[in-house]
A protein has these predicted regions:
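Alpha-helical transmembrane-bundle signature of multi-pass membrane transport and export proteins
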Residues: 1-275
Length: 275
């Protein structure tokens, strides 16, 4: 929760500051982004350099079999497969924040500063949820909570889609970030506790691929749906589909729905039997 909260703090500051910096000079946000990306790239290169030295000291490079072991483990572990795919489709259908520029300009009629606030609102809600989870990390009926917060995420998208009030739209997006933080926390905790130590890195890599794919595909789906249906119907339909997913997933993944306390998860108790 603390790690995700730190990431969300940056997500809050970035869009809000970007909107106001754009007012000063339109090209300035891009210049700032380039500088920050160069710094990030330098950090990544430093990590890769250290990793290369570690392999030279005795560790071998992983082969394809070890890479695919993470995918195979997710496929045969119902709680992991259910949590990851639920997040994938929820973001695919319900992640309508990519349409924020269209809503800011044509529906809410706010400027670049308002757009920055719209983009920052989900992260602001996520920070609040992250602080709450850090203070009280233990959840009862975590599996059911996961489905409830995913349905709530879809409901907030519907509210955002039909809203013509800027404060209401901000509130809807903030609540979407709040409930999405609970979803991310539950999913990431399931991934950590339901996975053996020797597979944890590879399973985490599978999760990251799903997360990245859902974000990018969700943005594409939102734009395509808005072009076909219009912005408001696209957002409302996406939110409704997300609620349907939250209702359909429990019967498909009953092991996920039965989870009570996350800290009680054990890898050997979550793996489906293999033939």
């Amino acid at each position: 929760a603390l790690r995700t909260t730190a990431m969300q703090l940056a997500t809050v500051a970035g869009p809000a500051l970007g909107g106001f910096i754009y007012v000063l000079r339109p090209e300035l946000p891009y210049a700032v982004s380039v500088v920050l990306m160069v710094i990030a790239l330098a950090c990544v290169l430093a990590l890769r350099s250290r990793s290369a030295r570690t392999r030279a000291a005795g560790g071998g490079a992983p082969d394809w079999r070890s890479v695919l072991a993470g995918v195979a483990f997710v496929r045969r572990t119902p709680v992991l497969l259910g949590a990851i795919t639920l997040d994938l489709f929820a973001v695919l259908f319900g992640g309508q924040i990519s349409l924020a520029p269209l809503f800011a300009r044509s529906i809410l009629h706010v400027g670049t500063g308002g757009l920055g606030l719209l983009r920052a609102a989900p992260a602001a809600g996520a920070v609040i949820a992250g602080v709450m989870l850090a203070r009280r990390p233990s959840l009862r009926r975590a599996g059911r909570v996961l489905f409830v917060v995913v349905a709530a995420f879809g409901a907030t998208m519907i509210v955002f889609g039909v809203s013509r009030s800027f404060p209401l739209s901000l509130a809807a997006l903030a609540v979407s970030g709040f409930v999405d933080m609970f979803s991310m926390n539950i999913r990431s905790t399931i991934g950590a506790l339901a996975t053996p130590n020797e597979l944890r890195g590879r399973v985490n890599a599978v999760e990251m691929v799903f997360i990245s794919a859902s974000n990018q595909l969700g943005a594409f789906e939102s734009g395509a749906a808005a072009a076909l249906l219009g912005a408001v119907p696209a957002v409302v339909a996406g939110g409704a589909l997300t609620i349907v997913l939250a209702a359909v997933w429990p019967p498909l993944f009953p092991a996920l729905a039965r989870i009570d306390r996350l800290e009680e998860l054990q890898p050997e108790q979550t793996t489906a039997p293999t033939a």
